[in-house]
């Protein structure tokens, strides 16, 4: 007799015993571990990282700030079964330690502030939202990093090359060639402009000779320099700001702040560890480089690589976008953390506005924090996101309920609600194909066609 050694499988149910003579090779793994472990990681580290991303929140005059400390959860008001019966959400109150610091006087006020009720995961890896069991499905996305692709131009039949630096959080940076052999840059999917404009704006190179020394004397580099409207760093900053934010009066300081905030501010831009690893590997950088934001070396190496692709250099090649090595899975913990960060960023603007409107002596952490943006962001995710779905359960309960009235109706409902491939042996293939589109109509036809043939 063999007894299962998996503690998860015996914690709530009877021990499964095997009377086979050949022992089991391995125990059945916990099939929902990807859900439970991801949410546990979010509870332990994800919330802390989300608070750290916006802390501290400084006033416009920099004389006051708000800092976030440790956080903790209270006890849920109802159990999982009670939440289902009462049609309420299974959630627990979230409290955060918030400090208000007046830098002029040195005064510090600290309070534990209620940040809203946060949905908790059940032992089954699901969530109870308004009494309904829901599950957050994982998302397959393109992994952060740098990717190079090529395609044929339909009019000129030339090969067009494209390079994308994709972060985990922040603005995309894209380089692309065109049929006129000009290298352009597109920042955060805005209008494209000559790529040399970005080099001058970042202060990497300013003169024509310096840019040629960095990128080489390729014909495409020469053509791009000829199309560049700026010749100095200041002109490049103004031109970049004018194209990125048309209608606003451009200044050098505002343009420099915009550029630094887009790619070099850790609070707004994050490559994540996997993104930095893939950039280091693709561009042959030092593996010890662990910068979470872009560096000037990243931009230079990316431009050199795409120039090499255009010129047919050896050792450079495009990437297969559909390869699973260039994709990753966003699990439930990361998805909720991203949504929680959106709520915090909305709250950040409210806190900054209230600091400028209230008297410093009357300000308390409780009076500054407005939890409505956070609550709304979490509610929006669980209620209307495509990744938050009703728990796909079998119809055992429904079948049992219907079987009390008529077991034949229960069988028909189970057939129609199952996948067509599972009940093609019971009904015709034509009806099975229609079941994917018109389940209620098929249910009627199944009942009318099979009613007489079913045994009493």
Where are these regions (language model features)?
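Short, basic/aromatic recognition patches
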Residues: 419-426
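Structural and coupling elements of P-loop NTPases
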Residues: 84, 441-444
């Amino acid at each position: 007799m063999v007894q299962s050694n998996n503690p998860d499988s015996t914690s709530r149910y009877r021990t499964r015993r095997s009377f086979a003579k050949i022992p089991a090779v391995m125990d059945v793994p916990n099939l929902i571990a990807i859900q439970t472990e991801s949410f546990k990681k979010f509870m332990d580290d994800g919330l802390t990282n989300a608070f750290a991303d916006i802390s501290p929140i400084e006033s416009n005059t920099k004389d006051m700030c708000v800092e976030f400390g440790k956080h903790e959860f209270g006890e849920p008001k109802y159990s999982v079964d009670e939440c289902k019966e009462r049609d309420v959400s299974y959630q627990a109150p979230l409290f955060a330690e918030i400090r208000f610091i007046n830098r002029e006087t040195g005064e510090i006020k600290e309070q534990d502030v209620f940040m809203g009720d946060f949905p908790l995961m059940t032992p089954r890896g699901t969530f109870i939202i308004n009494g309904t069991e829901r599950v957050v499905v994982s998302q397959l996305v393109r992994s952060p990093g740098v990717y190079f692709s090529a395609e044929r131009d339909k009019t000129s039949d030339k090969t067009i090359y494209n390079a994308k630096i994709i972060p985990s959080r922040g603005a995309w940076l894209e380089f692309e060639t065109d049929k006129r052999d000009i290298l352009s840059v597109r920042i955060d999917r805005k209008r494209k402009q000559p790529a040399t404009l970005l080099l001058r704006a970042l202060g990497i190179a300013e003169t024509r000779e310096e840019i040629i020394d960095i990128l080489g004397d390729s014909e495409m580099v020469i053509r791009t320099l000829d199309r560049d409207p700026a010749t100095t760093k200041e002109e490049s900053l103004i031109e970049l700001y004018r194209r990125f934010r048309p209608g606003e009066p451009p200044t050098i300081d505002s343009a420099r702040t915009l550029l630094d905030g887009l790619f070099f501010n850790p609070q707004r831009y994050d490559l994540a560890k996997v993104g930095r690893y893939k950039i280091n590997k693709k561009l042959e950088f030092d593996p010890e480089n662990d910068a979470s934001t872009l560096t000037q070396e990243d931009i230079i190496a990316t431009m050199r690589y795409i120039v090499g692709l255009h010129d047919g250099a050896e050792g450079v090649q495009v990437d297969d976008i559909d390869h699973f090595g260039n994709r990753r899975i966003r699990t439930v913990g990361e998805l909720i953390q991203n949504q929680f960060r959106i709520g915090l960023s909305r709250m950040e603007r409210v806190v900054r506005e209230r600091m400028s409107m209230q008297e410093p002596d009357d300000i308390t952490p409780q009076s500054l924090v407005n939890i409505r943006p956070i609550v709304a962001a979490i509610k929006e995710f669980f209620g209307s996101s495509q990744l938050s779905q009703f728990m796909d359960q079998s119809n055992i309960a429904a079948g049992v309920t219907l079987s009390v009235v008529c077991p034949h109706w229960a069988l028909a409902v189970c057939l129609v609600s199952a996948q067509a491939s599972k009940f093609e042996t019971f009904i015709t293939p034509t009806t099975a194909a229609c079941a994917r589109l018109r389940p209620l109509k098929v249910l009627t036809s199944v009942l009318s066609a099979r009613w007489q043939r079913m045994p009493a």
